[in-house]
Every structure is written in C-alpha cells, then in structure tokens.
C-alpha cells in the first residue's frame, strides 16, 4: 500500500473568511475552523486509488473532509473511510495550490472551533463517480441546495490540477480536467507571496546599505567616544610614561579648572569622582589634605588635587576637570577627515596631559607635603568623607564657628581616618567634643576604633599643633602604593563608602607599629592604629572615660572589642579585661572559660571513667604477661624493659 503525504503551513491560511462560505444545511459546520481548512492535511492514497484526507495539526493525523470537492462527488455512505477519486488528489498536488481549498468550511458532524477532527465518513464517493471523474452534475444528495456563492465557487474550482500526475505517484486515473483555472489562482498567490518577500528583502538590504555608510562615513563619531577610555587608560599608564614637558600647561589648566564647577557636591554615590588621588600622601594632619586611602580602586591615578585651593571644589576636579580638558582637546568634530593629523596630535596631547596628571599627582603629593599653599578647610564640598584634609589647621582657628561646625560635619567623618591611613602618629591638643554636633551618630562602624581619638581631637580641635617635618619625597611616593594595598575594595552599598574611606582593619597591623612610648605619650592619637585602641584601652586607665557616651560610640566600642579582642588579649592581657566593659570571647578563650569544669559534666563521672580505664589497662597487662609466660618468655625481663601493669 503506497501513500502520499503533503505537509502544509497553517499560517498561510486566510483567516478572514466570509462566514457565508460553508455548507448551509450541515449544522455542525463551524466558520471558526476556516483557518484549519487550508489544506493542512496529509493525503494518503491506497493502492486501489482511494484517498484518505487526514488533517494534520502538529502531526496528529485525523480523518478530514476535502473542502473543495464538488457536490456531485459527495455521497453519504456507510461509516467507511472517505474514498476520493484521483481528481480530488489532483486538487492537493502541491502546497502552492492549496489556497483555493481554504475557502470552504469543514464538513462533518465533528467539526468545531476547538477541534478540526472532521470525520470524512460523512463524505464518500460512489464507485460510479470514481469511474466518471469528468461528470459535472451537482446533485446535492437529497440535502438542501447550496448557496449560489458556494455553488459558483465550486464551479469555478477545478478538481484536476495539472500538477497532480507529477506529484502523485500512486493515483490510478489521472483526470483530464482543464487545469488553467486552478493553476492560475495558486500561481497568482505564489507570485504575490514572492513579490512581498522580494520587497521585504529589498527593504532589509536597503536598510543595511544605509546603515553601513552611516557607520563608515563619520569616523570621528567613533573616535570621540573612544577618546575618553583611551585617555583614561592613558591616565592609568601615566605613572610609567613620562611626558614632563606637557605638564606645565596642565597645571595652568588645572588652576583654571577649579572654577569649572563651584559649589558643593553631595552625591553620596559618586565616590569615584570625589575621592582624592592615591598620590596625596600627606603624613601630617597640619599639612595640606592628608591622603585618605579611601580612594576607590577605579580612581587610583586621578590628577593630584594639590593644584586646587580651598575655594576649589576639588572633588569636582577629577571628572569635571577631565571632561573640561576633553572638551578642549578633542578635535573639532566637523573636520575629522580634513585634519586627521591634527586630530591625532590632539589625541596625543590629551593623552600626554592625562599622563601628566599622574606625574603631577606624584609631584604634587610632595608639593602638598612641602607647601602649605592649600589648607583644605572643607569649603571644597560638604561631602568630604574621603576628600578634605579633615584636620584642623590654623585656618580653622581663623574661621568662624559656622565654618568650624561645617568642617566638623565634613571632615570629622574622616578626621580619624587620615592619620590612621597614613600610619603616622599625630599629636593633638585638647579639643571640644564633636560628638555633640551629631557627627558621631553618622560615622560608620568600621571607623569605630577612632571614636576615642575623635573625642580627643574634638576636645582640642582648635589648638593647632605644628606638623612634624614633611617626609622625604621618596617615602611620599612609595606610600601611595602601600596605602592602596591597605585599602579594602569599595563596598557595594553607598553606606560602605565610609568603610572604604577608612580601611581601619587593614591598617591595624602596620599602624599598630608605633612604640608603646608613642602610644603612652600620645594617647589621643589612638586613631593611628586600630590595634592600639585595645592596647590603649588596656594600658591607660583614662580611656574608658575618654570614650564618647553616644550610642554610636558604644556600638563602635563593641565592634572594636569584637574585632580587636585578640589584640587586646595580646597587648593588654588580663589588665585589659578589667578596663573593658564588654569582652567578646572567642574559641581561643576556651582554656580560660573552661578551667575547673569537668568536661564530662561531673567529677564523679570523671573519676568513675578514670577508674574503669585503669582496670582495663591492668587486665590487659596481666593478660599480656600471662601470654608471655605461657610462651616461655622471661616475664621479669619484660617488666625490667618497662612493661607496667
């Protein structure tokens, strides 16, 4: 038995079908299945020429009716499989010609909008009509007459496609019906589809062609967006690349740029723009802007802020200054092609300038240390967690109380951090309490080790101590790298900004290096190390009193004790425990906590278990001696060798 199957595409069907185009007297017909009528069937041919039309939806073959069959070929028969003459098969010879079949609706009692399982048993062909495929009599088999629209449509449809003999291999009787009427419609349909496809492809090609010149024609558009990353990379490389001759103009520009943006920037999430360069390594608070190692990793080699005076909002220096330079230096956009060489020169100059930013950063780190031209008093911006010098300078004394309070707000956040980060001991006089200003409440816990230091600083805020002599430039240059190494990565949350500003935990090890003499001599500078907090707390009895009574200080004290409990134990020993109100024990303290406690839970149980163990050992030794004696060994010699019962 040979059969022939034809796949179809259901989406090609015209779903907007005239509802009148269905068999009128069959009440089960549904117009909603019009889209299923598009020849989405498998047509199976038996060896004797019978055709089984089966609907295939996702390859679920079910018997279905052939919608385009003339009524002369529709006969109600018994419940056998619908047999169709080869003329019907010629109507379904090719997928391109299925369009004319899609107009008629489902026939059969099982047709419904939800299911296209049409029982073709309703449709059978008599043997007489199989023998006479060419007859065109339209008797409706006792049923009601068809509508004129259906009748005219069926008359216009030829059941004998010329392509049927070519595509069907097992049909017995090819039909000689005129092929033109059917062939024209599918051809027109195919031509329409092909034309629309061509148009669509042409439009796509045109769009692509238009896009290509748009990309190629203005190379400057690409060059300008690429400049900024290149320059940023240049800034990163500037430390290794020395283009000193360009640096002086950069200084001039930097001096001019502070006026690029005036005012204060309170953006809490824009740390990278506000952080000072890592190169600013002023080891002494009295000098300009002690370096806050707070700088985020991405801003490592920003141009040095030492160029900026107090009135400059230097936190804007990094990005506004760079953008300002970029605006100055990028080549004029209208002439990318006419002046390629000029464009390259400008790019090179721009890169050199950024490189000189880095070089100047290093030079100005030293200049800041040596020159007091810049006393940052916090006017550069209120958001100074990592930016201002933060230390009270002689200018602070001249400033009014409002300025001083502002400086407290801006600088006290990192007041402790600068000395800590530089790892240098500082001498401070007595300072008024800043905690009353509400500062301590807002300070992050990571800085907790500095609370007493802040208290001491605030007590002596306006008594300015001259800074020690500046550190040599070689040391100043080396320090930024070391400080960066101690900087923790910037936290994801904005609140952790302060944590990144003061890597207290990282600094504890190296910053605890100051000798006990320094700590005792300068107990107020306890900010110099996180570990020294515990040591000072244990060594000097005044420390508990010096701690601020604010809730934040309590929280900090607790966190300091937790983190520095080991250092407190090592530095202060038991004396520190007496001076500490809260102690967080660790597993290492088990020997202290568990002394005098029987692990088994009771002394009686412990004694009983020890006695049982001794009995076992005694029995084993006796058994061993008996075994040796039984073997003929010298028991006395065995005992002399150290064998014990």
Swiss-Prot record:
Disruption phenotype: Produces fewer branches per conidiophore and thus has significantly lower conidial yields.
Extent of Basic residues compositional bias: 315-326, 351-361
Segments of skewed composition (Low complexity): 362-373, 528-546
The keyword Transcription regulation belongs to this UniProt entry's keyword annotation: yes
Induction: Expression remains constant during conidiation. Expression is positively regulated by BrlA and AbaA.
Family, per entry: Belongs to the wetA family.
Biased composition (Polar residues): 240-249, 509-518, 562-572
Protein name per Swiss-Prot or TrEMBL: Developmental regulatory protein wetA
Chain segments carrying region Disordered: 158-187, 201-249, 284-376, 461-578, 596-618
Biological role: BrlA, abaA and wetA are pivotal regulators of conidiophore development and conidium maturation. They act individually and together to regulate their own expression and that of numerous other sporulation-specific genes. BrlA, abaA and wetA act together to positively regulate the expression of the Pks1 gene cluster that mediates the biosynthesis of an anthraquinone derivative pigment that contributes to conidial pigmentation that provides protection from UV radiation, heat and cold stress.
Entry keyword annotation includes Transcription regulation: yes
Alphabetic keyword roster: Activator, Conidiation, Sporulation, Transcription, Transcription regulation
Biological process, per Gene Ontology: conidium formation; sporulation resulting in formation of a cellular spore
